Amino acid sequence: MAHPHLLAERISRLSSSLEKGLYERSHAIRLCLLAALSGESVFLLGPPGIAKSLIARRLKFAFQNARAFEYLMTRFSTPEEVFGPLSIQALKDEGRYERLTSGYLPEAEIVFLDEIWKAGPAILNTLLTAINERQFRNGAHVEKIPMRLLVAASNELPEADSSLEALYDRMLIRLWLDKVQDKANFRSMLTSQQDENDNPVPDALQVTDEEYERWQKEIGEITLPDHVFELIFMLRQQLDKLPDAPYVSDRRWKKAIRLLQASAFFSGRSAVAPVDLILLKDCLWYDAQSLNLIQQQIDVLMTGHAWQQQGMLTRLGAIVQRHLQLQQQQSDKTALTVIRLGGIFSRRQQYQLPVNVTASTLTLLLQKPLKLHDMEVVHISFERSALEQWLSKGGEIRGKLNGIGFAQKLNLEVDSTQHLVVRDVSLQGSTLALPGSSAEGLPGEIKQQLEELESDWRKQHALFSEQQKCLFIPGDWLGRIEASLQDVGAQIRQAQQC
Protein backbone atom coordinates (compact mmCIF):
# COMPACT_ATOMS: atom_id res chain seq x y z
CA MET A 1 0.00 0.00 0.00
CA ALA A 2 1.79 3.14 -1.24
CA HIS A 3 1.64 6.33 0.83
CA PRO A 4 -1.12 5.13 3.22
CA HIS A 5 -1.42 8.44 5.06
CA LEU A 6 -1.79 10.35 1.79
CA LEU A 7 -4.59 7.97 0.81
CA ALA A 8 -6.31 8.48 4.17
CA GLU A 9 -6.09 12.26 3.71
CA ARG A 10 -7.48 12.03 0.20
CA ILE A 11 -10.46 9.90 1.26
CA SER A 12 -11.14 12.35 4.10
CA ARG A 13 -11.17 15.27 1.65
CA LEU A 14 -13.34 13.29 -0.76
CA SER A 15 -15.86 12.62 2.00
CA SER A 16 -15.88 16.28 3.05
CA SER A 17 -16.69 17.28 -0.53
CA LEU A 18 -19.54 14.78 -0.72
CA GLU A 19 -20.96 16.05 2.59
CA LYS A 20 -21.27 19.69 1.42
CA GLY A 21 -24.82 20.97 1.66
CA LEU A 22 -26.04 17.88 3.51
CA TYR A 23 -26.87 18.43 7.16
CA GLU A 24 -26.48 15.76 9.86
CA ARG A 25 -25.66 13.20 7.18
CA SER A 26 -21.87 13.02 7.59
CA HIS A 27 -21.90 9.55 9.12
CA ALA A 28 -24.26 8.23 6.45
CA ILE A 29 -22.14 9.70 3.63
CA ARG A 30 -18.94 8.28 5.11
CA LEU A 31 -20.31 4.78 5.54
CA CYS A 32 -21.88 4.84 2.07
CA LEU A 33 -18.51 5.95 0.70
CA LEU A 34 -16.79 3.11 2.57
CA ALA A 35 -19.36 0.68 1.19
CA ALA A 36 -18.82 1.99 -2.35
CA LEU A 37 -15.04 1.75 -2.03
CA SER A 38 -15.30 -1.86 -0.88
CA GLY A 39 -18.18 -2.97 -3.13
CA GLU A 40 -20.84 -3.45 -0.43
CA SER A 41 -24.54 -2.62 -0.12
CA VAL A 42 -26.34 -0.19 2.20
CA PHE A 43 -29.89 -0.04 3.55
CA LEU A 44 -31.24 3.35 4.61
CA LEU A 45 -34.25 3.30 6.93
CA GLY A 46 -36.20 6.47 7.57
CA PRO A 47 -39.25 8.59 6.72
CA PRO A 48 -39.68 10.23 3.30
CA GLY A 49 -37.92 13.50 2.51
CA ILE A 50 -34.73 13.11 4.55
CA ALA A 51 -32.22 13.04 1.65
CA LYS A 52 -31.92 9.28 1.23
CA SER A 53 -31.92 9.55 -2.57
CA LEU A 54 -29.61 12.57 -2.48
CA ILE A 55 -27.03 10.57 -0.51
CA ALA A 56 -26.99 7.94 -3.26
CA ARG A 57 -26.75 10.56 -6.02
CA ARG A 58 -23.82 12.22 -4.28
CA LEU A 59 -21.87 8.97 -4.20
CA LYS A 60 -21.82 8.93 -8.00
CA PHE A 61 -19.47 11.93 -7.89
CA ALA A 62 -16.90 9.97 -5.88
CA PHE A 63 -15.91 8.15 -9.08
CA GLN A 64 -14.78 9.37 -12.47
CA ASN A 65 -17.40 8.80 -15.19
CA ALA A 66 -19.62 6.75 -12.88
CA ARG A 67 -23.12 5.96 -14.09
CA ALA A 68 -26.07 6.01 -11.71
CA PHE A 69 -29.46 4.34 -11.75
CA GLU A 70 -32.32 5.05 -9.37
CA TYR A 71 -35.85 3.75 -9.24
CA LEU A 72 -38.88 3.99 -6.96
CA MET A 73 -40.37 0.55 -6.46
CA THR A 74 -44.10 -0.11 -6.39
CA ARG A 75 -46.11 -3.30 -6.19
CA PHE A 76 -46.60 -3.00 -9.96
CA SER A 77 -42.92 -2.53 -10.88
CA THR A 78 -41.67 -4.89 -13.59
CA PRO A 79 -38.18 -6.25 -14.31
CA GLU A 80 -38.15 -4.19 -17.53
CA GLU A 81 -38.19 -0.97 -15.51
CA VAL A 82 -35.14 -2.01 -13.51
CA PHE A 83 -33.07 -4.24 -15.78
CA GLY A 84 -34.08 -2.83 -19.17
CA PRO A 85 -36.75 -3.60 -21.79
CA LEU A 86 -36.66 -6.58 -24.10
CA SER A 87 -35.06 -6.03 -27.49
CA ILE A 88 -37.97 -6.47 -29.88
CA GLN A 89 -35.61 -6.53 -32.83
CA ALA A 90 -33.45 -9.31 -31.36
CA LEU A 91 -36.56 -11.30 -30.51
CA LYS A 92 -38.11 -10.75 -33.93
CA ASP A 93 -35.05 -11.21 -36.14
CA GLU A 94 -33.02 -13.77 -34.23
CA GLY A 95 -35.44 -15.19 -31.67
CA ARG A 96 -33.13 -14.07 -28.86
CA TYR A 97 -34.50 -13.09 -25.43
CA GLU A 98 -32.27 -10.13 -24.67
CA ARG A 99 -32.64 -6.91 -22.69
CA LEU A 100 -31.47 -3.45 -23.69
CA THR A 101 -29.56 -2.60 -20.52
CA SER A 102 -28.10 0.79 -21.42
CA GLY A 103 -29.24 3.31 -18.79
CA TYR A 104 -30.52 0.62 -16.42
CA LEU A 105 -29.19 -1.22 -13.36
CA PRO A 106 -26.94 -3.74 -15.20
CA GLU A 107 -24.74 -0.92 -16.54
CA ALA A 108 -24.65 1.38 -13.48
CA GLU A 109 -21.88 1.75 -10.90
CA ILE A 110 -24.16 3.42 -8.33
CA VAL A 111 -27.68 2.05 -7.82
CA PHE A 112 -30.44 3.50 -5.64
CA LEU A 113 -33.68 1.57 -5.16
CA ASP A 114 -36.33 3.31 -3.08
CA GLU A 115 -39.17 1.47 -1.31
CA ILE A 116 -37.21 -1.71 -1.91
CA TRP A 117 -39.61 -4.03 -0.05
CA LYS A 118 -42.36 -3.35 -2.59
CA ALA A 119 -40.40 -5.13 -5.32
CA GLY A 120 -41.89 -8.33 -6.69
CA PRO A 121 -40.25 -11.79 -6.68
CA ALA A 122 -39.01 -11.49 -10.28
CA ILE A 123 -37.05 -8.33 -9.46
CA LEU A 124 -35.82 -9.63 -6.08
CA ASN A 125 -34.42 -12.87 -7.48
CA THR A 126 -32.46 -11.10 -10.21
CA LEU A 127 -31.29 -8.50 -7.71
CA LEU A 128 -29.95 -11.20 -5.36
CA THR A 129 -27.78 -12.59 -8.15
CA ALA A 130 -26.57 -9.10 -9.02
CA ILE A 131 -25.54 -8.42 -5.41
CA ASN A 132 -24.00 -11.83 -4.73
CA GLU A 133 -22.14 -12.47 -7.95
CA ARG A 134 -22.04 -9.07 -9.66
CA GLN A 135 -23.53 -10.82 -12.69
CA PHE A 136 -26.65 -10.41 -14.81
CA ARG A 137 -28.09 -13.12 -17.02
CA ASN A 138 -29.16 -11.46 -20.26
CA GLY A 139 -30.75 -14.09 -22.41
CA ALA A 140 -28.20 -16.80 -23.12
CA HIS A 141 -25.30 -14.70 -21.87
CA VAL A 142 -24.06 -13.94 -18.36
CA GLU A 143 -22.70 -10.41 -18.18
CA LYS A 144 -20.59 -8.87 -15.46
CA ILE A 145 -22.12 -5.77 -13.96
CA PRO A 146 -20.02 -2.80 -12.76
CA MET A 147 -22.13 -2.07 -9.64
CA ARG A 148 -19.94 -0.73 -6.84
CA LEU A 149 -22.67 0.44 -4.49
CA LEU A 150 -26.29 -0.53 -4.02
CA VAL A 151 -28.26 1.79 -1.76
CA ALA A 152 -31.71 0.46 -0.91
CA ALA A 153 -34.15 2.56 1.10
CA SER A 154 -37.50 2.25 2.81
CA ASN A 155 -39.51 3.77 5.62
CA GLU A 156 -40.14 0.33 7.08
CA LEU A 157 -38.32 -2.90 7.84
CA PRO A 158 -39.09 -6.15 6.02
CA GLU A 159 -41.56 -8.42 7.73
CA ALA A 160 -40.01 -11.23 9.72
CA ASP A 161 -40.06 -14.69 8.11
CA SER A 162 -40.82 -13.18 4.71
CA SER A 163 -39.24 -13.77 1.31
CA LEU A 164 -37.48 -10.43 1.73
CA GLU A 165 -35.07 -11.63 4.43
CA ALA A 166 -32.58 -13.05 1.93
CA LEU A 167 -32.20 -9.64 0.27
CA TYR A 168 -32.11 -7.84 3.64
CA ASP A 169 -29.24 -10.08 4.76
CA ARG A 170 -27.20 -9.00 1.72
CA MET A 171 -27.33 -5.35 2.81
CA LEU A 172 -24.28 -5.19 5.02
CA ILE A 173 -24.55 -1.64 6.33
CA ARG A 174 -27.88 -0.59 7.84
CA LEU A 175 -28.45 3.03 8.81
CA TRP A 176 -31.46 4.45 10.65
CA LEU A 177 -31.88 8.09 9.60
CA ASP A 178 -34.12 10.82 10.97
CA LYS A 179 -35.03 14.42 10.25
CA VAL A 180 -32.53 17.23 10.83
CA GLN A 181 -32.57 17.87 14.59
CA ASP A 182 -30.18 20.75 15.32
CA LYS A 183 -31.74 24.22 15.07
CA ALA A 184 -28.77 25.82 13.29
CA ASN A 185 -28.55 22.95 10.81
CA PHE A 186 -32.28 23.17 10.16
CA ARG A 187 -31.99 26.90 9.41
CA SER A 188 -28.99 26.34 7.11
CA MET A 189 -30.89 23.64 5.25
CA LEU A 190 -33.89 25.93 4.73
CA THR A 191 -31.83 28.85 3.44
CA SER A 192 -29.27 26.92 1.36
CA GLN A 193 -29.19 27.92 -2.31
CA GLN A 194 -26.88 25.12 -3.39
CA ASP A 195 -28.02 23.01 -6.33
CA GLU A 196 -28.16 19.52 -4.88
CA ASN A 197 -27.36 17.97 -8.26
CA ASP A 198 -24.10 19.88 -8.81
CA ASN A 199 -20.87 17.92 -8.58
CA PRO A 200 -19.15 19.03 -5.34
CA VAL A 201 -16.02 16.88 -5.84
CA PRO A 202 -12.85 18.24 -7.50
CA ASP A 203 -11.55 16.07 -10.34
CA ALA A 204 -8.30 15.37 -8.49
CA LEU A 205 -10.20 13.64 -5.67
CA GLN A 206 -12.39 11.40 -7.80
CA VAL A 207 -11.53 7.70 -7.88
CA THR A 208 -10.45 6.25 -11.22
CA ASP A 209 -11.38 2.77 -12.43
CA GLU A 210 -7.74 1.66 -12.13
CA GLU A 211 -7.51 2.87 -8.53
CA TYR A 212 -10.75 1.17 -7.60
CA GLU A 213 -9.65 -2.19 -9.00
CA ARG A 214 -6.23 -1.95 -7.35
CA TRP A 215 -7.73 -1.03 -3.99
CA GLN A 216 -10.01 -4.08 -4.02
CA LYS A 217 -6.93 -6.32 -4.06
CA GLU A 218 -5.08 -4.28 -1.44
CA ILE A 219 -8.07 -4.30 0.94
CA GLY A 220 -7.88 -8.10 1.00
CA GLU A 221 -4.25 -7.89 2.12
CA ILE A 222 -5.12 -6.04 5.35
CA THR A 223 -4.43 -8.42 8.26
CA LEU A 224 -6.71 -9.35 11.14
CA PRO A 225 -4.51 -9.51 14.29
CA ASP A 226 -5.17 -12.22 16.87
CA HIS A 227 -6.21 -9.78 19.60
CA VAL A 228 -8.78 -8.17 17.29
CA PHE A 229 -10.17 -11.57 16.31
CA GLU A 230 -10.50 -12.42 20.01
CA LEU A 231 -12.62 -9.30 20.50
CA ILE A 232 -14.84 -10.25 17.55
CA PHE A 233 -15.24 -13.78 18.89
CA MET A 234 -16.03 -12.42 22.36
CA LEU A 235 -18.80 -10.27 20.84
CA ARG A 236 -20.16 -13.22 18.87
CA GLN A 237 -20.23 -15.45 21.96
CA GLN A 238 -21.94 -12.76 24.01
CA LEU A 239 -24.62 -12.28 21.35
CA ASP A 240 -25.20 -16.04 21.21
CA LYS A 241 -25.95 -16.02 24.95
CA LEU A 242 -28.55 -13.24 24.77
CA PRO A 243 -32.11 -14.43 24.08
CA ASP A 244 -33.11 -11.21 22.29
CA ALA A 245 -29.97 -10.89 20.16
CA PRO A 246 -30.47 -10.91 16.37
CA TYR A 247 -29.37 -13.85 14.27
CA VAL A 248 -26.12 -12.99 12.47
CA SER A 249 -25.23 -15.33 9.62
CA ASP A 250 -21.69 -16.52 8.96
CA ARG A 251 -21.94 -14.73 5.60
CA ARG A 252 -22.66 -11.43 7.33
CA TRP A 253 -19.72 -11.88 9.72
CA LYS A 254 -17.40 -12.59 6.78
CA LYS A 255 -18.61 -9.59 4.78
CA ALA A 256 -18.30 -7.42 7.90
CA ILE A 257 -14.64 -8.40 8.24
CA ARG A 258 -13.95 -7.11 4.73
CA LEU A 259 -15.62 -3.84 5.70
CA LEU A 260 -13.30 -3.61 8.72
CA GLN A 261 -10.35 -4.27 6.42
CA ALA A 262 -11.52 -1.45 4.15
CA SER A 263 -11.85 0.88 7.15
CA ALA A 264 -8.28 0.12 8.16
CA PHE A 265 -6.99 0.46 4.58
CA PHE A 266 -8.57 3.86 3.98
CA SER A 267 -7.39 5.01 7.43
CA GLY A 268 -3.78 4.34 6.43
CA ARG A 269 -3.28 1.16 8.46
CA SER A 270 -2.02 -2.27 7.42
CA ALA A 271 -4.10 -4.18 9.99
CA VAL A 272 -7.59 -4.05 11.45
CA ALA A 273 -7.62 -2.26 14.82
CA PRO A 274 -10.11 -2.51 17.70
CA VAL A 275 -11.52 0.91 16.78
CA ASP A 276 -12.73 -0.51 13.44
CA LEU A 277 -15.03 -2.89 15.31
CA ILE A 278 -17.32 0.02 16.13
CA LEU A 279 -18.54 -0.28 12.53
CA LEU A 280 -20.23 -3.54 13.53
CA LYS A 281 -22.93 -1.48 15.25
CA ASP A 282 -24.21 -0.61 11.76
CA CYS A 283 -23.88 -4.16 10.41
CA LEU A 284 -25.34 -6.59 12.96
CA TRP A 285 -28.74 -5.16 13.93
CA TYR A 286 -32.04 -6.27 12.47
CA ASP A 287 -34.73 -4.07 14.04
CA ALA A 288 -35.12 -1.29 16.62
CA GLN A 289 -34.72 -3.62 19.60
CA SER A 290 -31.61 -5.30 18.27
CA LEU A 291 -30.15 -1.93 17.23
CA ASN A 292 -30.04 -0.83 20.87
CA LEU A 293 -28.79 -4.22 22.06
CA ILE A 294 -25.94 -4.32 19.52
CA GLN A 295 -24.85 -0.81 20.42
CA GLN A 296 -24.83 -1.69 24.13
CA GLN A 297 -22.73 -4.81 23.59
CA ILE A 298 -20.22 -3.03 21.37
CA ASP A 299 -20.02 -0.19 23.90
CA VAL A 300 -19.13 -2.74 26.61
CA LEU A 301 -16.55 -4.27 24.29
CA MET A 302 -14.96 -0.92 23.43
CA THR A 303 -14.93 0.63 26.91
CA GLY A 304 -14.14 -2.56 28.82
CA HIS A 305 -12.00 -4.88 26.73
CA ALA A 306 -10.70 -3.44 23.45
CA TRP A 307 -7.78 -1.67 25.12
CA GLN A 308 -7.59 -4.02 28.14
CA GLN A 309 -9.46 -1.60 30.42
CA GLN A 310 -11.15 -4.32 32.46
CA GLY A 311 -8.00 -6.42 32.56
CA MET A 312 -5.99 -3.50 33.91
CA LEU A 313 -8.63 -2.78 36.56
CA THR A 314 -8.57 -6.45 37.62
CA ARG A 315 -4.80 -6.29 37.95
CA LEU A 316 -5.11 -3.06 39.92
CA GLY A 317 -7.60 -4.67 42.29
CA ALA A 318 -5.20 -7.54 42.93
CA ILE A 319 -2.35 -5.10 43.61
CA VAL A 320 -4.49 -3.11 46.05
CA GLN A 321 -5.51 -6.28 47.87
CA ARG A 322 -1.86 -7.35 48.10
CA HIS A 323 -0.98 -3.92 49.47
CA LEU A 324 -3.65 -4.31 52.15
CA GLN A 325 -2.28 -7.73 53.05
CA LEU A 326 1.18 -6.27 53.50
CA GLN A 327 -0.29 -3.52 55.63
CA GLN A 328 -2.15 -6.09 57.73
CA GLN A 329 1.14 -7.80 58.45
CA GLN A 330 2.26 -4.55 60.04
CA SER A 331 -1.05 -3.93 61.79
CA ASP A 332 0.28 -4.73 65.30
CA LYS A 333 2.56 -1.74 64.97
CA THR A 334 -0.22 0.48 63.71
CA ALA A 335 -3.19 -0.75 65.79
CA LEU A 336 -5.46 2.18 66.50
CA THR A 337 -5.26 3.09 70.19
CA VAL A 338 -8.00 5.40 71.38
CA ILE A 339 -7.60 7.79 74.32
CA ARG A 340 -9.55 7.14 77.52
CA LEU A 341 -11.18 10.25 78.92
CA GLY A 342 -11.80 11.12 82.54
CA GLY A 343 -15.22 10.80 84.03
CA ILE A 344 -15.03 8.76 87.20
CA PHE A 345 -18.72 9.20 87.86
CA SER A 346 -19.75 8.49 84.24
CA ARG A 347 -21.92 5.43 83.83
CA ARG A 348 -20.06 4.65 80.56
CA GLN A 349 -16.37 4.98 79.75
CA GLN A 350 -15.72 7.63 77.11
CA TYR A 351 -12.93 7.72 74.50
CA GLN A 352 -11.61 9.92 71.74
CA LEU A 353 -9.45 9.49 68.66
CA PRO A 354 -5.74 10.35 68.81
CA VAL A 355 -4.98 13.91 67.76
CA ASN A 356 -2.89 12.71 64.80
CA VAL A 357 -5.91 10.98 63.25
CA THR A 358 -7.47 13.80 61.24
CA ALA A 359 -8.93 12.29 58.05
CA SER A 360 -12.67 12.79 57.50
CA THR A 361 -12.96 9.14 56.45
CA LEU A 362 -10.93 6.48 58.27
CA THR A 363 -9.98 3.20 56.63
CA LEU A 364 -9.07 0.67 59.33
CA LEU A 365 -7.55 -2.72 58.57
CA LEU A 366 -8.65 -5.94 60.25
CA GLN A 367 -5.76 -7.77 61.89
CA LYS A 368 -7.33 -10.93 60.53
CA PRO A 369 -10.18 -11.12 58.00
CA LEU A 370 -13.68 -11.74 59.30
CA LYS A 371 -16.91 -12.70 57.59
CA LEU A 372 -19.32 -9.84 58.23
CA HIS A 373 -22.74 -9.59 56.59
CA ASP A 374 -21.86 -12.55 54.33
CA MET A 375 -18.72 -10.84 53.07
CA GLU A 376 -15.03 -11.59 53.63
CA VAL A 377 -13.86 -8.28 55.12
CA VAL A 378 -10.27 -7.05 55.25
CA HIS A 379 -10.87 -3.37 55.95
CA ILE A 380 -13.68 -1.07 57.07
CA SER A 381 -14.26 2.59 56.25
CA PHE A 382 -15.76 4.84 58.94
CA GLU A 383 -16.92 8.41 58.79
CA ARG A 384 -14.77 10.19 61.37
CA SER A 385 -17.72 12.07 62.85
CA ALA A 386 -19.73 8.85 63.32
CA LEU A 387 -16.80 7.10 65.00
CA GLU A 388 -16.18 10.04 67.35
CA GLN A 389 -19.87 10.07 68.27
CA TRP A 390 -19.77 6.36 69.10
CA LEU A 391 -16.56 6.69 71.17
CA SER A 392 -18.12 9.51 73.14
CA LYS A 393 -21.71 8.40 73.57
CA GLY A 394 -21.95 4.78 72.46
CA GLY A 395 -24.95 3.50 70.56
CA GLU A 396 -24.96 2.14 67.01
CA ILE A 397 -21.92 2.31 64.74
CA ARG A 398 -21.83 1.66 61.00
CA GLY A 399 -19.01 1.27 58.48
CA LYS A 400 -18.50 0.34 54.84
CA LEU A 401 -17.17 -3.19 54.49
CA ASN A 402 -14.09 -3.23 52.25
CA GLY A 403 -14.96 0.40 51.54
CA ILE A 404 -17.87 -0.43 49.22
CA GLY A 405 -21.66 -0.29 49.30
CA PHE A 406 -23.75 1.12 52.10
CA ALA A 407 -22.49 1.44 55.67
CA GLN A 408 -23.40 -1.69 57.66
CA LYS A 409 -24.16 -2.04 61.37
CA LEU A 410 -21.14 -3.41 63.27
CA ASN A 411 -20.41 -5.08 66.60
CA LEU A 412 -17.55 -2.82 67.72
CA GLU A 413 -15.94 -2.46 71.15
CA VAL A 414 -12.89 -1.01 72.91
CA ASP A 415 -10.78 -3.72 74.62
CA SER A 416 -8.68 -3.45 77.77
CA THR A 417 -5.66 -2.21 75.77
CA GLN A 418 -7.78 0.62 74.31
CA HIS A 419 -7.77 -0.95 70.84
CA LEU A 420 -10.87 -1.11 68.63
CA VAL A 421 -12.09 -4.67 68.09
CA VAL A 422 -14.80 -5.72 65.62
CA ARG A 423 -16.60 -9.04 66.14
CA ASP A 424 -18.53 -11.35 63.83
CA VAL A 425 -21.74 -13.24 64.66
CA SER A 426 -19.73 -15.94 66.47
CA LEU A 427 -18.04 -13.17 68.53
CA GLN A 428 -14.63 -13.81 67.03
CA GLY A 429 -12.75 -10.54 67.16
CA SER A 430 -10.23 -8.72 64.99
CA THR A 431 -8.28 -5.65 66.05
CA LEU A 432 -8.56 -2.61 63.81
CA ALA A 433 -5.38 -0.89 62.69
CA LEU A 434 -4.42 2.19 60.80
CA PRO A 435 -2.82 1.64 57.38
CA GLY A 436 0.91 2.26 57.19
CA SER A 437 1.70 5.96 57.21
CA SER A 438 2.21 7.62 53.80
CA ALA A 439 5.62 8.79 54.92
CA GLU A 440 6.83 5.21 54.70
CA GLY A 441 5.90 5.12 51.02
CA LEU A 442 4.67 2.14 49.06
CA PRO A 443 6.37 -1.22 49.56
CA GLY A 444 8.86 -1.92 46.76
CA GLU A 445 6.84 -4.88 45.51
CA ILE A 446 3.68 -2.78 45.19
CA LYS A 447 5.49 0.18 43.69
CA GLN A 448 7.03 -2.00 40.97
CA GLN A 449 3.71 -3.64 40.11
CA LEU A 450 1.97 -0.27 39.85
CA GLU A 451 4.75 1.10 37.66
CA GLU A 452 4.42 -1.91 35.32
CA LEU A 453 0.66 -1.44 35.23
CA GLU A 454 1.01 2.26 34.48
CA SER A 455 3.46 1.43 31.67
CA ASP A 456 0.94 -0.98 30.15
CA TRP A 457 -1.77 1.66 30.47
CA ARG A 458 0.38 4.19 28.62
CA LYS A 459 0.96 1.68 25.81
CA GLN A 460 -2.77 1.03 25.45
CA HIS A 461 -3.58 4.73 25.51
CA ALA A 462 -0.91 5.40 22.88
CA LEU A 463 -2.35 2.64 20.70
CA PHE A 464 -5.82 4.14 20.95
CA SER A 465 -4.52 7.64 20.21
CA GLU A 466 -2.83 6.30 17.08
CA GLN A 467 -5.82 4.23 15.93
CA GLN A 468 -8.60 6.73 16.59
CA LYS A 469 -7.80 8.71 13.43
CA CYS A 470 -10.54 6.87 11.59
CA LEU A 471 -12.89 8.80 9.30
CA PHE A 472 -15.68 6.26 9.60
CA ILE A 473 -16.08 6.22 13.41
CA PRO A 474 -18.32 8.85 15.12
CA GLY A 475 -16.59 11.16 17.58
CA ASP A 476 -18.92 10.35 20.48
CA TRP A 477 -17.75 6.73 20.45
CA LEU A 478 -14.12 7.82 20.51
CA GLY A 479 -14.94 10.13 23.43
CA ARG A 480 -16.40 7.29 25.49
CA ILE A 481 -13.35 5.11 24.87
CA GLU A 482 -11.02 7.95 25.86
CA ALA A 483 -13.05 8.48 29.05
CA SER A 484 -12.81 4.78 29.93
CA LEU A 485 -9.03 4.81 29.52
CA GLN A 486 -8.69 8.02 31.53
CA ASP A 487 -10.74 6.46 34.34
CA VAL A 488 -8.35 3.49 34.47
CA GLY A 489 -5.37 5.85 34.48
CA ALA A 490 -6.85 7.92 37.29
CA GLN A 491 -7.39 4.83 39.46
CA ILE A 492 -3.80 3.71 38.88
CA ARG A 493 -2.45 7.14 39.84
CA GLN A 494 -4.65 7.19 42.94
CA ALA A 495 -3.25 3.83 44.02
CA GLN A 496 0.30 5.13 43.53
CA GLN A 497 -0.41 7.98 45.94
CA CYS A 498 -1.63 5.75 48.76
Curated annotation (Swiss-Prot):
It catalyses: ATP + H2O = ADP + phosphate + H(+). ADP binds at residues 23, 49-54, 196. ATPase activity is stimulated by ViaA. It comes from the Bacteria. Keywords: ATP-binding, Chaperone, Cytoplasm, Hydrolase, Nucleotide-binding. InterPro entries: AAA+_ATPase, ATPase_RavA, ATPase_RavA_C, MoxR, P-loop_NTPase, RavA-like_AAA_lid, RavA_ATPases, RavA_LARA_dom. CDD domains: AAA. GO terms for cellular component: cytoplasm. Its EC number is 3.6.1.-. It is found in: Cytoplasm. It is an enzyme of class 3 (hydrolase). SMART domains: AAA (SM00382). Pfam families: AAA_lid_8, ATPase_RavA_C, bpMoxR, LARA_dom. One of its GO terms (molecular function) is ATP hydrolysis activity. Signal peptide: none annotated. Component of the RavA-ViaA chaperone complex, which may act on the membrane to optimize the function of some of the respiratory chains. RavA functions as an ATPase. Belongs to the RavA family. Homohexamer. Interacts with ViaA. This is Regulatory ATPase RavA.
